[in-house]
């Protein structure tokens, strides 16, 4: 992976080419991981519904899983080799051993371990090659404990989804994103892409995430419950139990019977609470006013409060005059009635004035940055124009002063008497 040092425009071309290759490798790795998971699900369902009848086909499916796993491991190594080459290009290195750190080696080994876990392609000890069960009373016709754990561990390959989404999003390949991100010290990682899609397509992201979690956890729960030949192990029951647990309803008509099933339901409830919080945040943001709507609403409320203040002030003056009038006439009953109305009008006027003041403070605090930028730009242009005009006037004054100096010099030379000529003796 070493070689000559590439700088300048060649380094940019090399970086773009490496990112394109990483994108293709990550895409194919995700395809192979999905293929392996699909074959694993097919093997488990065939074993559940058909038992030992199709033992040769089950062995063939296991061999295909092993083959896809081998290709996946090769792609994982190739991807990290491209990562090392990209690091060497960015930092101007020649020796790949300098770019390969211990942390990266540990990450590569961990990924190889996670992606390499799969059911071993061996026939079940409970089945013969003829497709008959050796001990029909002891074997329930499903995966053993070790094989079930290896099968479920293949779901850990889904960690490749964020990597493929990051490379497919175009953020790393966009020069504008990289330039602005470098100026603002923003790292374009998986969380940035998740926030990006959460802001641009929140409905699609939450729907896909929710459906994916439902289907995955429902199948995992069915596998866990089938180990004990429980009635909850049917996929239809788990497809009902998982959404009810996800939505934190819990009718109690279907319950898990195994320890692993209870753990899956607990994790499903926690994920449901998190997704519900995200959904509430998205809905609250969608129900908020945008800038134009907020300005219109504040403007109309300002007019409404100003009108109420005028009406309250007019009512206060009216009741004060009526109170003064009935006090002069010695009508104590009417005077007390109008005094109560006057105090109520004073209270209403103070309340409306307080609301109007709060609205003004809220409007003043909502300073639009773009508007402020435009105001500053206009102010800068005005100052520049004034400065240029002042410089022109100063230049004009300087020219007039030079001309006046020349005129004064000429006038003084004309008024100076001629020097007497000395005659030769």
Swiss-Prot record:
Membrane topology: Multi-pass membrane protein
Main location group: membrane
Compartments, record wording: Cell membrane; Cell projection, Ruffle membrane
Region (Calmodulin-binding): 284-345
GO molecular function terms listed in the Swiss-Prot or TrEMBL record: calcium-activated potassium channel activity; calmodulin binding; intermediate conductance calcium-activated potassium channel activity; inward rectifier potassium channel activity; potassium channel activity; protein homodimerization activity; protein phosphatase binding; small conductance calcium-activated potassium channel activity
Post-translational modification: Phosphorylation at His-356 by NDKB activates the intermediate conductance calcium-activated potassium channel activity, and conversely it's dephosphorylation by PHPT1 inhibits this activity.
Keyword Transmembrane helix: yes
Pfam families: CaMBD, Ion_trans_2, SK_channel
List of residues that carry Phosphohistidine: 356
Gene Ontology annotations for the cellular component aspect, listed alphabetically: apical plasma membrane; basolateral plasma membrane; neuron projection; neuronal cell body; plasma membrane; ruffle membrane; vesicle
Subunit structure: Homodimer. Homotetramer. Heterotetramer of potassium channel proteins. Interacts with MTMR6; this interaction leads to selective dephosphorylation of PI(3)P in a lipid microdomain adjacent to KCNN4, resulting in a decrease of intermediate conductance calcium-activated potassium channel activity. Interacts (via the C-tail domain) with CALM1; the calmodulin binding is constitutive, does not require calcium and mediates calcium-dependent gating and four calmodulin molecules bind to one channel tetramer.
Role this protein plays: Intermediate conductance calcium-activated potassium channel that mediates the voltage-independent transmembrane transfer of potassium across the cell membrane through a constitutive interaction with calmodulin which binds the intracellular calcium allowing its opening. The current is characterized by a voltage-independent activation, an intracellular calcium concentration increase-dependent activation and a single-channel conductance of about 25 picosiemens.
Family listed: Belongs to the potassium channel KCNN family. KCa3.1/KCNN4 subfamily.
Protein name stated in the entry: Intermediate conductance calcium-activated potassium channel protein 4
Species annotation: Rattus norvegicus
